[in-house]
Regions:
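Active-site loop segments of alpha/beta catalytic cores
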Residues: 1-144
């Protein structure tokens, strides 16, 4: 189950901890299945968000994976390919995949995380060509 918080990134950490974190903890504690916690624009909130109780922290495309890994209590990160890159062509996607892979490898070498799950660093944009998604998955399998 993924708890997807599109608005958390508008808050500072103090307000997040007071007005959002207790409810995120309650929601995540109410389900007995693997949980992912993701927020948009939440690079500075990742530490607080990782206290909500999920097994996986989703990372949006605005923060490098190795930086995110230093901010969380999670051993598993998910993300963080920029969904706009699906409009930029295969070469741009391939370069981004290589960059993200390098960031993940650095985080793993430091012992910050164990595992990475590939995903977009936010939702699929409405006008994205489905074939671009298929090609991105193929590139991830080749490069990632």
């Amino acid at each position: 189950m993924q708890l997807f918080d599109s608005w958390a990134g508008y808050l500072n950490e103090r307000d997040y901890r007071e007005f959002v974190l207790p409810y995120s903890q309650e929601i995540l504690a109410s389900v007995d299945i693997p949980r992912i916690h993701f927020g948009v624009g939440t690079g500075e909130l990742l530490q607080a968000m990782s206290e909500a109780g999920s097994e996986v922290m989703g990372v949006d495309y605005r923060v490098a994976m190795d930086t995110a890994a230093q901010r969380v209590n999670s051993r598993v990160l998910q993300g963080n390919l920029d969904p706009a890159l699906l409009f930029a062509g295969d070469d741009a996607v391939r370069q981004a995949v290589r960059t993200i892979r390098g960031e993940v490898e650095r985080a793993q070498q430091r012992g910050d995380i164990d595992t990475h799950i590939w995903n977009l660093g936010h939702g699929v944009l409405p006008t994205t060509d489905a074939e671009a998604i298929t090609r991105a998955v193929s590139i991830i399998h080749e490069e990632g």
